[in-house]
Amino acid sequence: MAIVKCKPTSPGRRHVVKVVNADLHKGKPYAPLLEKNSKNGGRNNNGRITVRHIGGGHKHHYRVIDFKRTKDGIPATVERLEYDPNRSANIALVLYKDGERRYILAPKGVVAGDVIQSGVDAPIKAGNTLPMRNIPVGSTVHNVELKPGKGGQLARSAGAYAQIVARDGAYVTIRLRSGEMRKVLSEGRATIGEVGNSEHMLRELGKAGASRWRGVRPTVRGVVMNPVDHPHGGGEGRTSGGRHPVSPWGMPTKGFKTRKNKRTDKYIVRRRNK
């Protein structure tokens, strides 16, 4: 994997920094694992914007990823690594001994030809998936299940990982990249190692159009809007907003705590780092 800084042959190329991975498959994705991925421009069924800054972007299919990894006892060979437009991580196409193919998140260090497997008897090796009660304390994992059988939900983006720091009865304690430490059920599964493509954070799109290709629209500051559109809007000439920063709906921002789910507070051992 290489970091390539483009030559300034035009204003749009001047600031571009690319992450080039020669190991990625250059052909088409595996068709049976593709699904339609329709665009909605951030609108709901009433046509109203429910998520801002979404619209346009290149068409692409959704790759069906196996986050559950429940095909136990059957070894699988990594056929190839692929780019996935739906996530920051790369994905791996694996071929099981019984002939079935699935996509999984590509772990760091796993290359084409490697053999992976799932189940309680799987060895502690990058890419293998086990219940967390069978993973040694201190191990680095990713694709961590919050609810056993639901599929991995934590540590799935490029370069992400969690560390198992303790085991206590039916729960294990994991430390996330944010610094948060929380308990999860030890019956839940996790994959050994960290997610690959950690250099993703080093890329620079270089121009606004590159964000538009990805379906991301511009973010407009509230102070340049009209009062009808934002609490910071209006005023004669340039203003500072005239109040503490708030969202377009009047909710205080920049440090104001918005977490409402008190039901799961008991599972959080330590809050994330600020």
From Swiss-Prot:
Tree of life domain: Bacteria
Gene Ontology CC, one term: large ribosomal subunit
Pfam families cross-referenced by the UniProt entry: Ribosomal_L2 (PF00181), Ribosomal_L2_C (PF03947)
Basic residues compositional bias, start-end: 256-265
Keyword Acyltransferase: no
Any one of the GO BP annotations: cytoplasmic translation
Keywords: Ribonucleoprotein, Ribosomal protein, RNA-binding, rRNA-binding
GO molecular function list: rRNA binding; structural constituent of ribosome; transferase activity
Disordered as annotated region, ranges: 223-265
Function (record text): One of the primary rRNA binding proteins. Required for association of the 30S and 50S subunits to form the 70S ribosome, for tRNA binding and peptide bond formation. It has been suggested to have peptidyltransferase activity; this is somewhat controversial. Makes several contacts with the 16S rRNA in the 70S ribosome.
Similarity comment text for this entry: Belongs to the universal ribosomal protein uL2 family.
Database matches in HAMAP family: Ribosomal_uL2_B (MF_01320_B)
Subunit structure: Part of the 50S ribosomal subunit. Forms a bridge to the 30S subunit in the 70S ribosome.
Name of the protein in its database record: Large ribosomal subunit protein uL2
Natural source organism: Vibrio parahaemolyticus serotype O3:K6 (strain RIMD 2210633)
Source taxonomy: Bacteria, Pseudomonadati, Pseudomonadota, Gammaproteobacteria, Vibrionales
